[in-house]
A protein has these predicted regions:
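NAD(P)+-binding Rossmann beta1-loop-alpha1 motif at the extreme N-terminus of oxidoreductases
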Residues: 1-81, 138, 142, 209
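NAD(P)-dependent Rossmann-like dehydrogenase/reductase catalytic/cofactor-binding core
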Residues: 2-8, 12, 30-31, 201, ...
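Short, flexible turn/loop "capping" segments at secondary-structure junctions
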Residues: 27-28, 114, 179-184
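A short helix->loop->beta-strand "cap" motif at the edges of active sites that frequently abuts
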Residues: 31, 143-147, 169
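Rossmann-like NAD(P)-binding element
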Residues: 39-45, 57-149, 156-160
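Rossmann-fold dinucleotide-binding core
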Residues: 125, 148-233
Length: 425
């Protein structure tokens, strides 16, 4: 049995939006010290301000509603109930005030100083393998020998990240499936080839302790590595369909703005970060299939430094109130195109097929677990909910689509075509 009480000092590598969000839930979990480490002092100052604002927003129902006024889901939550629940707001449910919590936050530009007494470290930097390997090599030298070293990556191999750490048995993947950790539920835990069971179990207990405004965390421990884990693997593969649809629209004289106006929004991409999505697509391109090559628009935004909300511009321009869209009225030729070309069942079929591949590859053992992970991560039904009865029809559709689109990666796998997934309940 692992003892969570041994985790007293917590460190986060990276002071961006994601790192700040992780630090917030770590502080609310009640650790004695939480350190945010970044090379840039200005980023650390912004991180401290953001963390304090987000914690202050949980002090009362009034502040909560004001802070989340533009969030269509959170603005309708029963905050009185949430504010009284440790699972929702952590130690604030025990009347611990913001000042006391913020006094436990440390910021540091020197990695060696920031992790010298850390019991648990989470890395939340850009999705670049070389950068992560460099950080984990340093963590292996600077942190105590018992420290668990976690990466928030959803894309990259934990085995490769751990190679230079000098302690691959202590390295795990711990991925928040959200860009705002206090509002997410799903956390996916991933082993590397040499990760110990004790490290995985401790990581899982740490993950379950993180508060969420939606209540108790749902943690999934994968049996083995998979690019994208569960939720992002399905999402990234599904993006192949929307990339194809965008190209078809362009060839039909329909602008991206028209598609955006017709509810094919890129807002989530701006929130996640154009750079993050670009690096993920490149990793899939190099490690899964060349068909995941980043599309032209994403590539242009990446090289222009338009990384989304965090820099004020991506697919949209952003201000404090959100994206500035100024979209045109939807034209008839756009609605006609969508009615003729867009088939949501193809997207569902792609997700079902990729979920079946996860079972075939032994990444997870149960289709019900995949469905639950998708539900908890996206608040949408998982692929098997309808796929259990429509897999034959969807397999035929997907076979045809893979042929006309030239995307052979999307061909239905044997498990999807036969329905054998039903044996993996």
């Amino acid at each position: 049995m692992v003892d969570l009480k041994k985790i007293k000092n917590f460190a986060v590598i990276g002071g961006g939006i994601m790192g700040s969000g992780i630090a917030q839930v770590a502080l609310l979990s009640g650790y004695e010290k939480v350190s945010v480490i970044d090379l840039n002092n200005e980023i650390l100052e912004k991180s401290r301000t953001l963390i304090q604002q987000r914690i202050e927003a949980l002090e009362s129902e009034e502040k909560c509603k004001e802070f989340f006024a533009n969030n269509d889901i959170l603005k309708n939550l029963d905050f009185k109930k949430k504010l009284a629940s440790f699972e929702s707001v952590g130690i604030m449910a025990n009347n611990v005030d913001t000042k006391t919590i913020m006094d436990r936050l440390c910021t540091e530009t020197d990695l060696s100083k920031g992790v010298k007494d850390a019991d648990f470290v989470i890395e939340a930097v850009s999705e670049m393998m070389e950068l992560k390997q460099t950080i984990f090599k340093q963590l292996g030298s600077y942190s105590p020998p018992w420290t668990i070293l976690a990466s928030n990556t959803s894309t990259m191999s934990i085995t490769k990240i751990a190679q230079k750490s000098k302690r691959p048995d202590k390295v795990i993947g711990l991925h928040f499936h959200t860009f705002f950790p206090i509002t997410g539920v799903l956390i996916e835990i991933t082993p590397g080839e040499k990760t110990s069971n004790e490290s995985l179990e401790l990581g899982r207990k740490v993950a379950q302790k993180f508060p969420s405004l939606f209540g108790e965390r749902f943690t999934v421990q994968l049996e083995k590595e998979s690019p994208g884990l569960i939720a992002n693997r399905l999402a990234i593969t599904g993006s192949l369909y929307f990339n194809w649809l965008t190209n078809q629209a362009k060839n039909s004289g329909i602008s991206r703005e028209q598609l955006e106006a017709a509810n094919f929004s890129s807002e989530a991409a701006d929130l996640i970060g154009i750079d993050t999505i670009y690096y993920c697509a490149k990793y899939f391109e190099e490690n899964v299939s060349p068909e995941f090559t980043p599309n032209e628009r994403l590539t242009d935004l990446f090289y222009a430094g338009k990384f989304g909300r965090k820099v004020g511009e991506g697919f949209y321009k952003w201000n404090e109130d959100g994206p500035i869209k100024n979209l045109p009225p939807v034209e008839k030729k756009t609605t006609d195109f969508i009615a003729k070309v867009f088939d949501p069942e193809i997207y569902s079929a792609i997700q079902l097929n990729e979920a079946c591949k996860l079972l075939e590859e032994g990444v997870v053992k149960s289709y019900e677990l995949i469905d639950k992970a998708i539900l908890k991560g996206t608040f949408m039904p998982g692929p098997f909910v309808v796929g259990k009865t429509k897999y034959k029809e969807w397999a035929e559709k997907l076979e045809k689509f893979a042929k006309i689109s030239g995307k052979s990666y999307l061909k239905p796998c044997a498990m999807m075509k036969t329905g054998k997934f039903i044996d993996y309940k």
